[in-house]
């Protein structure tokens, strides 16, 4: 299977969108925007550890088949490899989430349940990709001894 380059593109999803804001050999960081009342598929990554950082809003995160956590930004949750999970936006304005994945592999995906007809289907391909806009954030590699700062709110 040909690897898709997700840099400088936004992946449109039925629940919102996501795009890659930083990647190196060991980690990929994605920015997710989830619309109110919408949720990601109940899915797992057999070989990948995932961290979710809720930047804005309130969310419900399903962990496995028996646990649900309600989160209010700022909040975080770590998800071990193989644990099925789903994230739902509860806030009127939706939610913004940073998703950290290691190792880097978008094909490491098993969809168990999906409200949008994607059960057992792979990650979206080029047909779902659009160009980033000028106000979309991309994390740069800071120079040694320096930090980079980003504002996720419009104010």
Q: Language-model features: where?
A:
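Double-stranded beta-helix
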Residues: 5-12, 86, 90-142
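Structured binding elements
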Residues: 52
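A generic "binding-loop/recognition-motif" signal
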Residues: 38, 47, 67, 83-84, ...
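A short glycine-rich, His/Asp/Glu-containing loop-to-beta-strand
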Residues: 6-44, 48, 136-155
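Short acidic-glycine-tyrosine-enriched beta hairpin
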Residues: 65-85
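Short beta-strand segments
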Residues: 30, 40, 67-69, 77, ...
